[in-house]
From Swiss-Prot:
Family classification: Belongs to the flavodoxin family.
Gene Ontology molecular function: electron transfer activity; FMN binding
Matches recorded under Pfam families: Flavodoxin_1
Highest taxon in the source lineage: Bacteria
InterPro entries, per the entry: Flavodoxin, Flavodoxin/NO_synth, Flavodoxin_CS, Flavodoxin_lc, Flavoprotein-like_sf
Protein name: Flavodoxin
Keywords, comma-separated and alphabetical: Electron transport, Flavoprotein, FMN, Transport
Cofactor(s) the record lists: FMN
Flavodoxin-like domain sequence ranges: 4-165
Protein purpose: Low-potential electron donor to a number of redox enzymes.
Length: 174
């Protein structure tokens, strides 16, 4: 078993593709990828280092498989677990809800002890509002817009992976 569990939900394949890019960047020896639709509470509890991939749909809605899993997520003790969150959204058509689902996940796991890592700058994005925003003006995790900025995805994923690698101290564990 790898030391980082990456759990994602995806309807169109965009978030799944990002998950695979992250695994490629960080290494399959470090990252296990799992579809949240086929995952259990015990699957998540098995890891101290987690990455959650969740797209935002329409007016701030979570992807359906994640939405179904939220009650289970609320039962998990995340004390001392490091969690990075990434997701896809559309900053133009849904500018008032850009990557809201990332913020929704944070709102569920932080009260249960999660240490969320991987804050991401908002520079280069054009949106109105997001539940993923922190008080310091950064996103709580990596926001990807495959609809409007697909040409920036590879670079953003690469930079975020380097950041996650450092913040989770994965070099010391590999």
């Amino acid at each position: 078993m790898a030391i980082v569990g990456l759990f994602y939900g995806s309807d169109t394949g965009n978030t799944e593709n990002i998950a695979k890019q992250i695994q490629k960047q960080l290494g399959s020896d470090l990252i296990d990828i799992r579809d949240i639709a086929k995952s259990s509470k015990e699957d998540i509890e098995a890891y101290d280092f987690l990455l959650f991939g969740i797209p935002t749909w329409y007016y701030g809605e979570a992807q359906a498989d994640w939405d179904d899993f939220f009650p289970t997520l609320e039962e998990i003790d995340f004390t001392d677990k490091l969690v990075g969150i990434f997701g896809c959204g559309d900053q133009e058509d849904y500018a008032d809800y850009f990557c809201d689902a990332i913020g929704t996940v944070r709102d569920i796991i932080e009260p249960h002890g999660a240490i969320v890592v991987g804050n991401w700058p908002t520079e280069g994005y054009n949106f109105e509002a997001s539940k993923a925003l922190l008080e310091d003006g950064t996103f709580i995790g990596l926001c990807i817009d495959e609809d409007r900025q697909p040409e920036l995805t590879a670079e953003r994923v690469e930079k975020w992976c380097k950041q996650i690698y450092d913040e989770m101290c994965l070099a010391e564990l590999a």
